[in-house]
């Protein structure tokens, strides 16, 4: 449980002290919360960690690269150093499952598009390096290789963040094409990091993408499902323990067709999970439209938002929660830097105790 005496200076940059304030030193639960156990150390995780660095190292290194002042290798080295620092900071502060692949040079939706080979032809035609093609999609490109605009940007749900909108053309071949999550997992594993691989889920990716030709979302479902099955197969090969698939689109108002699509996708994807435990992670609200469908599927863990999800507690208490699944309870507000309320967290856990088995303490969204 986040320790009630852990405080921070709100004016400071995001650092070890700030992490201590948001999801800090964890302690033993009071006996009355889980009386059947003499003591119970809750496992903890976060959905994602800020990537820019406490001194904005990523921002400055990226700007130097764009100006031609450092090489691609130097930029990549800065990224690796930041990731290593952030992983070790989380370990130091008692996080049990540490997100990997939450880092991005620009945007996680853009990363997912590249991973799934959704790179429009106008960017391929530039014949740039993979890194520069990525940045051309993010920022546009004007130079000797051509002149193209960047992807459009849209508001990321109810936050001030804006994501890059993937473009899927009629000729796009959705398939597992990138290596980023697997390379980062290997780096984390080498450092002894208890990793949880994080990726935008197939349902949210397809719902937020823009289809630029005659084909529609339904034309790409089969290939997208195959790509995610291949992703899980690769994680099995690497020996990964957990895969987090983020599906924030589930908190929106869903139609019957949306729910059917989500169910169709995951009935197939989850067959491929093998020995990898799959966490369905939601955030920015509750899943009132699809709670029964979510809990009926073969997920090993389900992440629910108890901070912004107005009906989340009622959904769990009214409908129950599968005892064979782990609840990743989003009780720590990921949107601010204030210390977590120890008493409020205990109250939520006491309410969940009669209906839930294993619980992992989680943030409500990425930090």
Question: What are the residue ranges of the model-derived segments?
Answer:
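Charged/polar low-complexity intrinsically disordered segments
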Residues: 4-5, 36
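Serine residues within intrinsically disordered or low-complexity segments
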Residues: 11-16, 39
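Domain-level signal for soluble alpha/beta catalytic cores
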Residues: 38-367
